[in-house]
Structures are given as structure tokens and as C-alpha cells.
């Protein structure tokens, strides 16, 4: 289940760093395959959880991130993965919708859209597609982290990441005045 968080963040970093090196088709394929793996992991985790017969919450991972025991006895901030009936269902929802968005984006983000809004400094439109898939992978990572959060602090971190990645996706066509205006709302 840890892999469901690792795959999208690795895709974000890889596609973000390889923006000028990958073709549109390779970036789209890599992003879709990565989310396809998350989809399989999400469905497997949810089905295994529900098939177990016990709907008790499970902490798959619980690690101390910040330890304040010197200040107050037993006070720490933990990061982890928490699976209960709601988060198991949301795993299915988030991974399914993210996978479908990746598939749809392969056809929608055609050259006409990218050339129309390509930034002059980039020289051509091919760099935009990798950036889009990197932002989409960050959004998926953020949503999955939000769904699997173990505490309110972790939930807040991922909620903010959802906001940042939404801003980046809404303002993707940063040379279009309408997209710039929409991303400021």
C-alpha cells in the first residue's frame, strides 16, 4: 500500500525533471502506466480489506516524524497510512478517476492545444505535456495522501498539496488570460 503513494510522487519528480527529454507520447504513456499501477494497488488493497470480514481500521504505517517528548511526555507528530472503510472506498474513487483523467488527457492534450498556448521561451509545445503530467501526478499523490492520512496534521499537509497542485493544473495554460484569472480564484 505504500507503493500507491510512492508511484505518483516518483512520476511527478521524473516527469518534472525530464520535461525537455521526453516526447509527448512517452510522457503520456508513463503517466498512464504509473496511474494504472496505482489503480491495481488501490483495488487490491480495498478488496483485500473488505474481503477480510473485519472492518476495523488498520494503520499500515505509523512512523514518528517530529518527536517532542523532551517538551511534553509522549508528544510527537506521526506520519503514516490509515485504512478504514471510508479510505478504502476513496482509494477506489481517487485511483479510478485519476486513471480515467490520464487516459482522457492523452487524447485531449493534442498538439493544437499545446501549440496554441506554448510559451515563446520554450520554443515548442512538447515541453508542456510533460509538465501537465507531472502536475497531474502531484495531484494524485496529494489526493491519495489525503485519503490515507493518519492524523489532522498529515491531512492538512496533503490538503495544501491538493490546493497547490490544483492551482498548477488550473493555470497550466499560463499564457492564456482566462486560465491565469481562473487560477487566482
Regions found by a protein language model. Name each.
Residues 1-7, 85-95, 152-165:
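Structural signature of hydrophobic alpha-helical transmembrane segments
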Residues 5-20:
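N-terminal signal-anchor/start-transfer transmembrane helix
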Amino acid at each position: 500500500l505504500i507503493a500507491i503513494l510512492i508511484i505518483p510522487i516518483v512520476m511527478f519528480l521524473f516527469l518534472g525533471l525530464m520535461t525537455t527529454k521526453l516526447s509527448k507520447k512517452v510522457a503520456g504513456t508513463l503517466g498512464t502506466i504509473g496511474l494504472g499501477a496505482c489503480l491495481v494497488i488501490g483495488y487490491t488493497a480495498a478488496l483485500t480489506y473488505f474481503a477480510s470480514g473485519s472492518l476495523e481500521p488498520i494503520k499500515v504505517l505509523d512512523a514518528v516524524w517530529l518527536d517532542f517528548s523532551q517538551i511534553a511526555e509522549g508528544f510527537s507528530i506521526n506520519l503514516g497510512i490509515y485504512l478504514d472503510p471510508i479510505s478504502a472506498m476513496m482509494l477506489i474513487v481517487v485511483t479510478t478517476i485519476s486513471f480515467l483523467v490520464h487516459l482522457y488527457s492523452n487524447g485531449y492534450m493534442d498538439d493544437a492545444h499545446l501549440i496554441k498556448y506554448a510559451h515563446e521561451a520554450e520554443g515548442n509545445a512538447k515541453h508542456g505535456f510533460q509538465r501537465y503530467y507531472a502536475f497531474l501526478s502531484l495531484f494524485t499523490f496529494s489526493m491519495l495522501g489525503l485519503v490515507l492520512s493518519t492524523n489532522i496534521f498529515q491531512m492538512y499537509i496533503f490538503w495544501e498539496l491538493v490546493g497547490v497542485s490544483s492551482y498548477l493544473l488550473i493555470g497550466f495554460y499560463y499564457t492564456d488570460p482566462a486560465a491565469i484569472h481562473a487560477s487566482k480564484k
